[in-house]
Regions:
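Short, contiguous clusters of charged residues that form electrostatic/catalytic patches at enzyme active sites
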Residues: 22, 26, 104-111
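A general structural signal for short secondary-structure boundary/capping elements
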Residues: 35-36, 90-94, 120-124
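Conserved catalytic-core segment of NTP-binding enzymes
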Residues: 1-81
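C-terminal boundary of histidine-terminating zinc-finger modules
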Residues: 87-108
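Catalytic histidine-centered segment of alpha/beta-hydrolase-like enzymes
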Residues: 83-85
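C-terminal alpha-helix
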Residues: 108-120
Length: 140
């Protein structure tokens, strides 16, 4: 962490996620105070494994938004069995379930990151998209 400029934390919508966040924030403060990297910042927090049907997920998001309103991403990654399935098929979530809620959410999180950093990806053209090696989604 001491070598990083910014920290982006994926945070599970669970109680232990909040405990882990508190520990990471303390470590970031210690790195600053020790002079190892005085400019290190907590760039953002992306809530993951969100299930809007549960009070716990909603409470965790509310707690994070209370203490870290500027860092909390608007995009929330939903709990999805497809995320766990993808690696067992040797695929990314974008290849395994391209139109699923999780794929869309991760794409939105990437867009939000780029927008926060005022970085805009060039439009996909034949010149800057790698050729597909084993399926049509390989360039995603």
């Amino acid at each position: 962490l001491a070598a990083a400029d910014e920290i982006l934390i994926p945070l599970q919508c669970e109680w232990f996620g909040l405990e882990g966040l508190a520990k990471i924030v303390r470590v970031i403060e210690q790195i600053r105070e020790a002079g190892a990297n005085p400019q290190i910042t907590l760039e953002g927090i992306i809530m993951t494994m969100y299930d809007g049907r549960t009070n716990l997920s909603r409470q965790v998001v509310e707690e994070v938004s209370t203490y870290f309103p500027a860092q909390l991403y608007n995009t929330v990654i939903p709990r999805s069995i497809r995320i766990g399935e993808a690696p067992s098929h040797g695929k990314t979530i974008f290849e395994h379930d391209p139109s699923g809620n999780a794929s869309i959410a991760y794409g939105n999180a990437a867009d939000e990151f780029l927008t926060r950093h005022k970085v805009f990806a060039p439009p996909a053209t034949a010149a800057n998209v790698p050729a597909a090696d084993h399926n049509d989604n390989a360039a995603l």
